[in-house]
Amino acid sequence: MPELPFSQEQFLTDVSRIYKKNGKVIVAVSEGAQYADGRFVADSGVRDAFGHAQLGGVATTLANLAKEKIGCKVRGIEFSLLQRCAAHCASLTDVNEAYMAGEAAVLNAVDGKTDYCVGFERTNGGDYHCGVKLIKLDDVANTEKKLPREWINREGNFVTQEYLDYALPLIQGESRPPMENGLPRFAKLAKIKA
């Protein structure tokens, strides 16, 4: 969990324990994982426009560490672009909310509202529902919203039931993107020069 300092010792203990028990282990790790001193586990030294570290390579770094220290067979997989190329795997909730955000953005832009981004706000109640809200860009640009500590287990290596209750509604439903000849069909927009 990137919200807490990463410990190589704890990582190796966890991986070793699960590997011995099951003969295999899958680790999901954030590119933002950092040591207690603030160094990223995999820092390339490259910075973005805001001066933040451009992250990447943590899977390979930790796979190599596990291979060296535990001696297990490893494979580091970085989702990077893959996750951006897999819209067909998006949940129906995610797809519906993307349409809500797009519609709200267009309607507000046509209405003359600029320098905002569209955000979501859950409504109270038993079933999951959310609405859209406009947020000033200055309030979100160059900021981050971290996972609350109460959503991370005591060991700092997994989430709590409270987090699962929050996240589960977000992955509900299967989207069925339109397909054509075995490939996703995308809108074809006319090229109109303004």
Go through the PLM ranges and name each one.
Residues 43-194:
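C-terminal non-catalytic interaction/assembly regions of soluble proteins
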Residues 1-75:
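Accessory alpha-helical/coil subdomains and C-terminal extensions
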